[in-house]
A protein has these predicted regions:
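Membrane-interface extramembranous regions
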Residues: 1-120
Length: 120
């Protein structure tokens, strides 16, 4: 049970960022318009989506997990700053803060030396 919870947390975070990365890369819905409204240059959704996919992949191996958490933490910090700066509604802020909180929890566990089993 001790290894199962961290493994499930890493898998869940990886899935969240795979989906987010795919949505950002696809530019579906209002993605491109949102990035433009937040002041990012054209095509930044591709950069962000690509980095989210890289971060998700890094979470899947115990040897790269720290770097995945660091990369995704920076991405989420930037996302939260953009959302706050543009006074986005709570319905956009709440998921961002929840995901950032899960990333922080995972990072604390990794830095404390928790043995996160590699996903297989």
């Amino acid at each position: 049970m001790r290894v199962l919870i961290p493994t499930v947390l890493m898998a869940a975070l990886a899935v969240v960022f795979i989906v987010a990365g795919a949505i950002n890369i696809s530019g579906r819905g209002t993605v491109k318009a949102d990035f433009a409204r937040w002041g990012f240059p054209d095509g930044f959704n591709l950069v962000c989506g690509g980095l989210e996919l890289v971060g998700a992949a890094l979470l899947l191996s115990a040897s790269t997990r720290f770097w995945g958490l660091a990369l995704l933490g920076v991405i989420m910090a930037g996302a939260i700053v953009a959302l706050l700066r543009h006074r986005e509604p709570v319905s956009h802020l709440a998921p961002a803060f929840a995901i950032a909180g899960l990333l922080a929890l995972a990072a604390i566990a990794v830095s404390a030396g928790s043995s996160f089993a590699a996903l297989s």
